[in-house]
Amino acid sequence: MSAQKIYLASLLLFICLVFPQSTAIVCNFEGHCVTSDDCINVCKSGEDPFLCVRSGPHKGMCCCLKTNGSVLE
């Protein structure tokens, strides 16, 4: 039983190291939108429009992709 626990802990550690959270989508929330097409002209400073958020605290705002910012959940 002890060997199984060590194996499981090692497997979980490996997964955490191989798949870090840094691969999550990162957004800068800008403007107001109803559809994702509305975000094309909203995103500034070379950011790519990603989607119009339709729920949660950022409802009705455009998610503009960037390198540092809020993680989209």
Swiss-Prot record:
UniProt keyword Chaperone present: no
- Its signal peptide is 1-24
Q: Which UniProt keywords apply?
A: Antimicrobial, Disulfide bond, Fungicide, Plant defense, Secreted, Signal
Report what the protein is called. Answer: Putative defensin-like protein 277
Q: What is the organism lineage in this UniProt record?
A: Eukaryota, Viridiplantae, Streptophyta, Embryophyta, Tracheophyta
* Biological process according to GO: defense response to fungus; killing of cells of another organism
Describe the family membership recorded for this protein in Swiss-Prot or TrEMBL. Belongs to the DEFL family.
Q: Which residue pairs form cystines in this protein?
A: C27-C64, C33-C52, C39-C62, C43-C63
Highest taxon listed in the record's lineage: Eukaryota
What is the source species? Arabidopsis thaliana (Mouse-ear cress)
- What cellular component terms from Gene Ontology apply here? extracellular region
